Curated annotation (Swiss-Prot):
One GO term describing the cellular component: cytosolic large ribosomal subunit
Domain of life: Bacteria
Keywords, alphabetical: Ribonucleoprotein, Ribosomal protein
Record gene name: rpmC
Family: Belongs to the universal ribosomal protein uL29 family.
Alphabetical list of Pfam families matching this protein: Ribosomal_L29
Protein name: Large ribosomal subunit protein uL29
Species whose genome carries this gene: Nitrosococcus oceani (strain ATCC 19707 / BCRC 17464 / JCM 30415 / NCIMB 11848 / C-107)
Listed GO biological process terms: translation
GO MF annotation list: structural constituent of ribosome
Length: 66
């Protein structure tokens, strides 16, 4: 899990990459949950919140650029 401070030091491209990776991870976890293979449900929550953090920082950067 990355802290918001660490995310703010990254560029927009790096944040987009991170968002893509987290989205893929979320998809895998959702598939595991559907097939009953997911052991720790908290992983899904962690990834979902990380996605929200990245999106928040991306929005902040876009608003600063304007």
């Amino acid at each position: 899990m990355m802290k918001v401070q660490e995310l703010r030091t990254k560029t927009e491209d790096e944040l987009r990459k991170e968002l893509l990776e987290l989205s893929r991870e979320r998809f895998k976890l959702r598939m595991q949950m559907g097939t009953g293979q997911l052991v720790r449900n908290s992983e899904l929550k962690r990834v979902r919140r990380s996605i929200a953090r990245v999106k928040t920082v991306l929005t902040e950067k876009q608003q600063q650029a304007q």
